[in-house]
């Protein structure tokens, strides 16, 4: 399995909109679900700092993830722009492989 982790600081008052976009029924998950290699996303909210979030996007393999990005650049960029309007910062924490 291949997991991509992202960290976000959400703009004050935009938490509900962020959760709607990045949550299990949000635009990101709907886009990713077009791929049979997509295994799901976990949206985590920091217990001590409610404007801090982490997402964990799970894929079968790195190659599957990269192929999906290549094939869906335009749709990915459109959703990413919508997310930019909700956040103060975004950082890729890393990519992780596991069995």
Show which residues each predicted segment covers.
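Short, conserved charged micro-motifs
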Residues: 14-19, 64-66
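An amphipathic, aromatic/His-enriched active-site/gating alpha helix that lines ligand/cofactor pockets
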Residues: 23-40, 58-93
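Short coil/turn residues that cap or connect secondary-structure elements
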Residues: 10, 14, 30-33
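Hydrophobic alpha-helical segments, principally membrane-spanning helices and signal/leader peptides
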Residues: 19, 25, 45-46
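Short, low-order "capping/linker" segments at domain edges
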Residues: 95-99
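Short, well-ordered beta-strand segments in beta-rich or mixed alpha/beta enzyme
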Residues: 2-9, 40-69
